[in-house]
């Protein structure tokens, strides 16, 4: 595995890390401030730059709970040649793949040559660094969905990922703010999905012919009379799966102008891919990446401290 300026994963050599052992119950931000004698702003910068792992898991959460015996690693690398783009932030990179956090408003890959996309951003970034590679799309997020994505840097790795996706990617989760008060703490939604002639995906309890079976698991985190915060785990990865399935149970995602009910309190689709866990396609190493829940989602609820239950 390559060690370059953007790596923040568990394969860093010890010389490129400050390795710290947790001695008492605390939070990650407070631990960094005290253990490394950092200012609060400097500690936040390091976390935001994806330079910290807890027990080999990348995290950016200020309030990540820490327990005695856990190991925190802080990268000594000062990131250079950093990608500066409002839509794409590199979370992890090695010679085989790159993990990004995509913001809403940009395509994962272009449908036509002139469309701006995360793939184009990465290809331009590689070219500026004189890397002889391109970003190969192995899965997608909708334009208006934000969150974690992975791109292969070679045809070889892309093929491994595409042929073994469900064996390699073992935990992919989303957070969504949806309309209405959820009736259940959790459940599973199953149906057949198929596009109609207008390219709108519709759901059916039986295969309409040419449909694709889809399974979505959900867990309610917070609920009010107006909105609910829901964690979603995909067992299948179909086009528009989450959006259609939440519509199916009467709780469409807020800000969804295609499958929603018109409720758009923050001016965007309230769907974010916050967790991506997989086995490295070349080394087999367990790779774990998570982002905080979007703050604008949390502001819809009284308790704005809800975070991923890691």
What kind of region is each of these model predictions?
Residues 2-310:
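RNA pseudouridine synthases
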């Amino acid at each position: 595995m390559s060690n370059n300026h953007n790596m923040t994963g568990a394969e860093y050599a010890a010389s490129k890390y400050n390795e710290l052992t947790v001695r008492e119950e605390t939070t990650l931000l407070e631990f960094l401030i005290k253990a490394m004698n950092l200012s609060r702003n400097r500690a936040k910068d390091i976390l935001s730059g994806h330079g910290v792992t807890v027990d080999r898991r990348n995290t950016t959460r200020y309030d990540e709970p820490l327990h005695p015996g856990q190991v925190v690693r802080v990268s000594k690398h000062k990131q250079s040649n950093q990608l500066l783009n409002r839509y794409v932030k590199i979370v992890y990179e090695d010679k085989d793949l790159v993990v990004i956090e995509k913001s809403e408003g940009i395509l994962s890959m272009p449908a036509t040559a002139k469309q701006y996309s995360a793939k184009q951003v990465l290809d331009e970034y590689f070219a500026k660094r004189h890397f002889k590679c391109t970003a190969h799309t192995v899965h997608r997020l909708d334009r208006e969905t934000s969150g974690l994505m992975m791109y292969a840097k070679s045809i070889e790795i892309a093929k491994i990922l595409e042929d073994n996706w469900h064996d390699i990617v073992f935990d992919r989760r989303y957070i969504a703010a949806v309309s209405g008060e959820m009736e259940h703490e959790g459940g599973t939604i199953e149906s057949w999905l198929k596009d109609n002639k207008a390219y709108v995906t519709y759901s059916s309890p039986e295969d309409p012919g040419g449909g694709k079976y889809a399974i979505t698991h959900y867990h309610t985190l917070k609920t009010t009379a107006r909105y609910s915060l829901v964690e979603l785990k995909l067992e299948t990865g179909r086009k528009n799966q989450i959006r259609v399935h939440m519509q199916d149970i009467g709780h469409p995602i807020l800000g969804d102008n295609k499958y929603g009910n018109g409720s758009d309190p923050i001016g965007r689709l309230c769907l974010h891919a916050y967790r991506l866990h997989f086995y490295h396609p070349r080394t087999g190493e367990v790779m774990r990446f998570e982002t905080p829940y979007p703050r604008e989602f949390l502001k819809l609820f009284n308790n704005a401290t809800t975070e991923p239950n890691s």
